[in-house]
Amino acid sequence: MRIAVRLDDITPDMDWEKFGEVKTLLDNAGVCPLVGIVPDNKDPNLHKQESKKDFWRYFATLKDKGWSIAQHGYTHIYTTKEGGLFPLNDFSEFAGLSYDKQLYMIKSGKEILRSHGLDTDIFMT
C-alpha cells in the first residue's frame, strides 16, 4: 500500500506539541510526508507559541531523513476574495493577483527557504 501525507501551515511558531504527536505517528508508520513551510509567516492565526529557534535546521534534518519540503505560499495572508482554479475557499493569498506579483512572492519565499538550507522545487498553496 502507498500512502501520501501532506502537512500544511508549518511555521517556526506553530503548535509544536501537536506537530510532535503527528510526527510520532508518521515515524511509527514509516511515512515521510510532504511538509508545506510558510517562508515568511505573517498570519496571526498560525502563531501558536514562541518560535522554535532551531526550526530551519530541524526541517533540514527531516529532509535528509526523507521528508519532502514544499514552499506553502509566502506570508499566508489572504489578500484577495478569489477562489482560484479549484475554489475550495473564496479567499486566497495568490489567486487574482498579477503574474508579476505572484512570481515575486514565489521567488521571495523560495529565497527564504534556500537561505536556510531548504532548497525545493515544490510549491503549494
List the model feature ranges, each with a label.
Residues 96-125:
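Catalytic domains of cell-wall/extracellular-matrix polysaccharide-remodeling enzymes
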Residues 68-76:
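Histidine-centered catalytic micro-motifs
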Residues 38, 74, 125:
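Short, well-ordered beta-to-alpha junction loops that form the rim of enzyme active sites
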